[in-house]
Amino acid sequence: MGFECSAESASWGTIREKVSLKENQEEKRMERSVAIVLAAGQGSRMGGSVKKQFLRIGSYPVLYYSLQCFQNSENIQEIILVTGEDYMSYCQKEIVDLYGFTKVTRIIPGGKERYDSVYAGLLACKECDYVFIHDGARPFISEEIIKRGLDGAKKTGACVVGMPSKDTVKLADENGYVKETPARNLVWTVQTPQVFRYSLIRKAYESMQSKDMTAVTDDACVVEQETGVKIWLA
């Protein structure tokens, strides 16, 4: 009798462990991260007729490298590609289909400005817990950067990938004179991807729609101004 009770207890313990493990696995599966890759820029600083995201580095276009990194990442479940309306067919045939980017579920037209394209990408997200916003003309990302960004976003809801500045930075006044020299250890140069809890960045962008966004230079600016959430630097 004692042995049977002990065996039954052990059996129920094993079942509970399996159920708990299954619940944890399902919870992890439910958490989805979407990468919004922006490829609608004009690339005016580069000159020439070919947009910089379509220029080739080695054997592949610049855009290929970031899409490939997101495609291979276990932390990314879906990619939304935002490009110029005239380039949607090109991106589908010559980028997505040609290189087998199966995580790209939608190619959508961008807007006049970068923030318009970001907002279009956010509206295209259907099931998303975290969103990576990345400039497709920046090819040098890695799985380590993706993980760093996601870990940071899980801490506060917002994370900007960047590097501590190696250069001394001067703040100027409106007349072009040095106004202030911030301590170099407090200055970062930020990059993309920038990673956010989806509900946070969506709310911030919606709040900004009725305001002047010409001074917005990155997505973190929108979160800073509209939510007050502290943004983690990683």
Model-found features: residue ranges?
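Active-site nucleotide-sugar/metal-binding loop of Leloir-type enzymes
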Residues: 119-130
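Conserved core of the sugar-phosphate nucleotidyltransferase
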Residues: 140-232
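Conserved donor nucleotide-binding strand/loop of the catalytic core
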Residues: 99-112
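Residue-level signal for inorganic ion chemistry
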Residues: 37, 63, 121, 135, ...
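Short, Lys/Arg-enriched N-terminal segments with co-localized hydrophobic residues
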Residues: 16-29
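N-terminal glycine-rich phosphate-binding loop and ensuing alpha1 helix
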Residues: 31-88
